[in-house]
């Protein structure tokens, strides 16, 4: 009894689902029948891919029109899921081929993917024909123009022809505008390039004429030293520690001698090394630093002694 009750409870739900499915199918069949004769899957496919929003007055109407065209193309009431997938793959397969093979395959109107592959293989095996291989495309998003079907519209209405003429005129105007802009920008680009070239040439010439100061200082040869001339005793001005009138005192007399002041020790001055011909400048820098450090060490020792 319990099993029978469960069957009675489940039976109406299954029937309801079947009724809903039949109502949906009949709804689509009524919409398709309102359009008149069935245009065929190929024409429906072209209409679906080339549909534009301008052909509908409202967004909802455009959506309903796309649904009608898709149902006319894929026929979900008669085809299974596998057949619908086969149609979608067959529509996309020619777009990955070369342009020559793509046109030829579409002219043959294959009904399945296997038939399309067989046509391409037979075309490549023909004697005397250059082997056509699909080109490798860069990874990434496919351009929007390749997502649409390249099937040409055979029966184009006046609205489609008007849109095509408007598109062509817009493209020609855009091309003329780009040409004019390029012609106007060419003289200014040439003038700027010549100005940059002139500035760079003048700067290079100045750099070639005037050598650097560092290079001149390093390659300069030292001037020859003059020999020291010693003064005669008793001549010249009087200096501390020197006898006044030395050499001129009368004989038999001794000049008065003054105590000489305590000599102050002279601090050695650092002698900076001068560059010689063929000597590296960094060696001169190192030697100069050594002498400066030596003088600083002597000064520090004297201050500690004091």
From Swiss-Prot:
Residues 188-222, 234-257 have a biased composition (Low complexity). GO terms for biological process: regulation of transcription by RNA polymerase II. Residues 123-171, 188-276 are annotated as: Disordered. Residues 45-129 form the SCAN box domain. Residues 264-274 have a biased composition (Basic residues). It comes from the Eukaryota. PANTHER family: PROTEIN ZBED8-RELATED, SCAN DOMAIN-CONTAINING PROTEIN SCAND2P-RELATED. This is Putative SCAN domain-containing protein SCAND2P. It comes from Homo sapiens.
């Amino acid at each position: 009894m319990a099993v029978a009750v469960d069957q009675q409870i489940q039976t109406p739900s299954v029937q309801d689902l079947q009724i809903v499915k039949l109502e949906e199918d009949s709804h689509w069949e009524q919409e398709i029948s309102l359009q008149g004769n069935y245009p065929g899957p190929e024409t429906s496919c072209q209409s679906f891919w080339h549909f534009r929003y301008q052909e509908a007055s409202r967004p909802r109407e455009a959506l309903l029109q796309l649904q009608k065209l898709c149902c006319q193309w894929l026929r979900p009431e008669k085809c299974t899921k596998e057949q619908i997938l086969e149609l979608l793959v067959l529509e996309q397969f020619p777009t990955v081929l070369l342009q020559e093979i793509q046109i030829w395959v579409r002219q043959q109107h294959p009904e399945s993917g296997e038939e399309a592959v067989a046509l391409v293989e037979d075309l490549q095996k023909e004697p005397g024909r250059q082997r056509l291989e699909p080109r490798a495309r860069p990874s990434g998003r496919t351009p929007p123009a390749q997502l649409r079907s390249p099937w040409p519209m055979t029966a184009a209405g006046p609205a489609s022809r008007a849109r095509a003429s408007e598109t062509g005129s817009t493209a020609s105007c855009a091309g003329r505008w780009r040409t004019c802009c390029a012609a106007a920008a060419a003289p200014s680009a040439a003038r700027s390039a010549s100005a940059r070239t002139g500035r760079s040439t003048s700067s290079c010439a100045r750099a070639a004429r005037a050598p650097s100061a560092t290079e001149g200082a390093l390659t300069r040869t030292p001037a020859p030293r003059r020999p020291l001339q010693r003064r005669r005793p008793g001549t010249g001005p009087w200096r501390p520690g020197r006898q006044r009138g030395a050499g001129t005192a009368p004989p038999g007399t001794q000049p008065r001698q003054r105590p000489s002041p305590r000599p102050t020790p002279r601090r050695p001055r650092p002698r900076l090394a001068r560059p010689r011909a063929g000597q590296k400048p960094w060696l001169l820098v190192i030697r100069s630093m050594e002498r400066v450090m030596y003088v600083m060490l002597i000064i520090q020792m004297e201050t500690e002694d004091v």
